[in-house]
Amino acid sequence: MRVQLLKHEIAKCMGWLFKRGLTSALSGNLSVRVDDVVYISPTKVPSYRVRAEDVSVVTMKGDHLAGRSPSSEMPTHLAIYKVTDSNAIVHAHSRFATALSCLGADLQSPDVEGKQLLGRIPLIPYARPGTSELAEAVSNGIKGFRGALLENHGLVAVGADLEGAYIVAEGIERAAQLVFDLSLFSRR
């Protein structure tokens, strides 16, 4: 994929995250790996305003090559790439997944579609956002899974490409919402 097209797709996907309610203006981020280069959403740019030229370009060692400053969650993205064969990551602070993460529970989708798409979504113990501790915890906990809940924080989803990671992120949020909905029915 050409670099400019890839950056455009990243900007467009940041807009999707906002429009679909998976992020607020300044929360959430995503990245795509191409060989040893990572294209990652910028810090301090509202998700609905990210443009292709804003996308940050970094090495797998974290050296900044181009674009705006990378997301503060860059260490976590790089750590995930080092332990998985994923080429894309979506990190979102969506309402239901974040609420479930605050309850301290893994996510098992209650519906057939969610079970097939997601499998089990583990809970990664709390670590302060943007830190090497979070990067280490996530890279240790996500191996073998399509995503994870980050305790008191949100979700992270991985995929072979950006669309795949986005679909997993949206699937995690939908599964978390179903868990919430079912809890309302079980109280009757």
Where are these regions (language model features)?
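Glycine-rich flexible loops
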Residues: M1-R188
